[in-house]
Amino acid sequence: MAVGKNKRLSKGKKGIKKRVVDPFSRKEWYDIKAPAFFEVKNVGKTLVNRTAGLKNANDSLKGRILEVSLADLQKDEEHAFRKVKLRVEDIQGKSCLTSFNGLSITSDKLRSLVRKWQTTIEADQTIKTTDGYLCRVFVIGFTRRRANQVKKTTYAQSSQIRAIRQKMFQVIQNQTSSCSMRELVQKLIPEVIGREIERATGSIFPLQNVLVRKVKILKAPKHDAQKLLELHGESQDVGTKVVKDVAPLESV
């Protein structure tokens, strides 16, 4: 066996052991405040690095997009399949004031609606609210059986699909053209647009599960601190409750 120097035994430690720094010690929590047209205003908290040197914590928070379940905002599990996007517009103390920045439904809900023996009909319309928001509304619906129908399938003809899509365009335009963003959200929560489409298209072909699949904000108006404060109302944890219009649909 060769005799030599054991490098592992004689090798010393290089330098001093580095001190472990907790990364959360450099961060601080901010409260997230939702607009007043949601029932719950105090949504949760978000992390951000503390203000240090030229880096301001407020600048890091402004423009941040947060995704929240509508069930948490409305205290109602019926809305668990909807997701709402909130955008941080301004900082007041340790509170982030947000604005509505979009709506969508979960992928598992969408997949559960697509079935055999029916036709899927989709439409989208670009609208502008009275307070300057340019957004695109996506709607989806599915055909259903007529009254006393024996046939298994419920496929719609191409002419019927075109006619239904035109009705969807008309309903979206009529329901959204003369309302602000606050009024639009209050129509989206109880699904007013979907039920109105079902009523309007009943004479062409009966539909079911008509939903506003997505709302995308294309352009928002210039930030106005006064309007943002009006949007949030008084600084309380509970906002206004949206009344559900649960009028039953007439049988076709």
UniProtKB/Swiss-Prot annotation:
Modified residues annotated as N-acetylalanine in this record: 2
Keyword annotations: Acetylation, Cytoplasm, Phosphoprotein, Ribonucleoprotein, Ribosomal protein
GO cellular component, one term: cytosol
Keyword Glycoprotein belongs to the record: no
InterPro entries: Ribosomal_eS1, Ribosomal_eS1_CS, Ribosomal_eS1_euk
Functional note: Component of the ribosome, a large ribonucleoprotein complex responsible for the synthesis of proteins in the cell. The small ribosomal subunit (SSU) binds messenger RNAs (mRNAs) and translates the encoded message by selecting cognate aminoacyl-transfer RNA (tRNA) molecules. The large subunit (LSU) contains the ribosomal catalytic site termed the peptidyl transferase center (PTC), which catalyzes the formation of peptide bonds, thereby polymerizing the amino acids delivered by tRNAs into a polypeptide chain.
Protein name: Small ribosomal subunit protein eS1B
Organism of provenance: Schizosaccharomyces pombe (strain 972 / ATCC 24843)
Gene (UniProt): rps102
